A protein has these predicted regions:
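Blade-level signature of beta-propeller repeat domains, shared across WD40, Kelch, NHL, RCC1
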Residues: 356-391
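Short loop/turn segments that connect beta-strands within beta-propeller blades
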Residues: 133-137, 175-179, 224-229, 265-269, ...
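Short, solvent-exposed loop/turn segments at conserved positions within beta-propeller repeat blades
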Residues: 121-125, 164-166, 213-219, 254-258, ...
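Short coil/turn segments at the loop-to-beta-strand junctions that recur within blades
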Residues: 145-150, 187-193, 236-242, 277-286, ...
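Blade-terminus and WD-like Trp-Asp/Gly-His loop motifs, strongest in beta-propeller folds
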Residues: 102-110, 152-161, 196-205, 242-251, ...
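N-terminal export/targeting signals for secretion/compartment entry
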Residues: 1-82
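N-terminal low-complexity, Pro/Thr-rich disordered segments
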Residues: 56-123, 313, 383-391
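Beta-propeller fold detector
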Residues: 139-144, 182-187, 231-236, 271-278, ...
Length: 391
């Protein structure tokens, strides 16, 4: 068998165990089974692809499809490859704000809010992301696959880049206007559970890669240095949808089984759980959205007794903000309006999205939950969900 035939056979086998099948099955089963199947499917593909590519992440020119549409600790190497893309005007990023505990003054403002499709829009085709800064019109950004936009796409803290994992479990990074698109190959990464999370320097992301499937399942969580593709393992972590605090010192994630939320340091050590959440408590959490700059507060989706845990897919809905040290629910000055989503900014303020009639409103709160200001959200964005907020 010649080399070309071998590569074709391996590619065909990998297609048969594509993570697309995992996604469909995971969405029809319990969260725990979904996580197990996610790992199993990705690992099987890695074993077959490994014969041709090895275990190193490789950044190579992307040749498996169109680039994103522009807008008019042991380590291994995941080498990035630039993807040619059409030059287009770029949006302007504001300077990164200093990290604060949340004692914001009256001059605090809402930064750039980034939007993507809601879960009801799942599909195979590409979809545009958008940004909105109060006082300006919404800006159309790059397009990414719909499933990735819903399940794992995440905007960097500086608002300059987007990271996502595609249907083949490859990590992608591109500027928000679609330029400088890169695909990281060689290892498959988890697209559904341990989804990408940016480091506060906007130069690294944490991912979970599948190392092998035989004789037993082996996965590892680590950090990818995007400039070089270097992958460094950070700990034996098990959970979903991680968040990284703006001060760089805290990782937070649901454990995906008992309803607990775990916090560790940036190296995956010194683990603790949010009190009175999960296990035998009457509240649980399987979905988190945002972590305060120092890791002391977290915006999440609380579930009550007997409430279904949902599936493995990411949910960005928020109905509470908790103190991670006490488990106490923070009182938010929202005027009786329903909380839909919430994101912390690097200065410690909180951007809360609330529903008001036929449109939504963005409310800026200080670190104690007191209202600073609010602004109506454009009606064109009502059917979108917020993916993040950058200063």
């Amino acid at each position: 068998m010649n080399d070309d035939r071998l590569r074709l056979d391996l590619a065909a086998l990998a297609d048969e165990v594509s993570p697309v099948d995992l996604r469909d099955r995971a969405l029809r089963t319990s969260r725990r089974l979904g996580v197990q199947r996610a790992v199993a499917t990705s690992a099987a593909a890695v074993v077959m692809l490994g014969a041709a590519t090895g275990t190193a992440f490789a950044l190579m020119p992307r040749d498996d499809g169109p680039a994103p549409v522009p807008a008019t600790t042991p380590s291994t190497t995941l080498t990035p490859t630039p993807t040619p893309s059409e030059a287009t005007p770029t949006t302007t990023a504001s300077p990164e704000a200093a990290v604060s505990s949340g004692a914001a003054g009256p001059t605090a403002t809402i930064g750039r809010v980034f939007y993507g499709p809601q879960r009801s829009a799942e599909g195979a085709g590409p979809v545009r992301l958008w940004s909105f800064r109060p006082g300006s019109e919404p800006v159309r950004l790059l397009s990414v696959p719909t499933d990735a936009a819903i399940s794992n796409a995440v905007v960097s803290p500086d608002g300059e880049r987007v990271a996502w994992v595609d249907d083949s479990s490859y990590l992608h990074v591109a500027d928000v206007d679609g330029t400088d698109a890169r695909t990281y190959r060689g290892n498959l990464v988890d697209p559904d559970c341990w989804t990408p999370a940016w480091a506060p320097d906007s130069q690294r992301v944490t991912v979970s890669r599948v190392v092998s499937a035989e004789p037993s399942m082996v996965t590892e969580v680590g950090v990818v240095e995007l400039s070089s593709g270097k992958f460094t393992r950070i700990g034996d972590l098990r959970g979903c949808h991680p968040l990284w605090s703006a001060d760089g010192k805290v990782l937070a994630f649901p454990d995906a089984s008992s309803g607990r939320v775990t916090l560790t340091d940036q190296y995956g050590r010194k683990g603790r759980s949010v009190p009175n959440l999960g296990g035998n408590a009457d509240r649980s959490c399987f979905d988190v959205a945002s972590l305060s700059p120092d890791g002391s507060r977290i915006a999440l989706r609380l579930r009550g007794p007997g409430e279904e845990s949902g599936d493995v897919a990411r949910e960005l809905d928020v109905n509470a903000v908790l103190d991670t040290r006490t488990g106490r629910k923070l009182d938010l000055e929202l005027g009786g309006r329903k909380l839909l989503q919430a994101y912390f900014q690097a200065d410690g303020t909180l951007v809360a999205r609330v529903g008001v009639g036929d449109r939504n409103v963005l409310v800026l709160l200080d670190g104690d939950g007191r209202k600073i200001s609010e602004t109506p959200e454009p009606t064109s964005l009502k059917g979108q969900q917020i993916l993040g907020v950058a200063d």
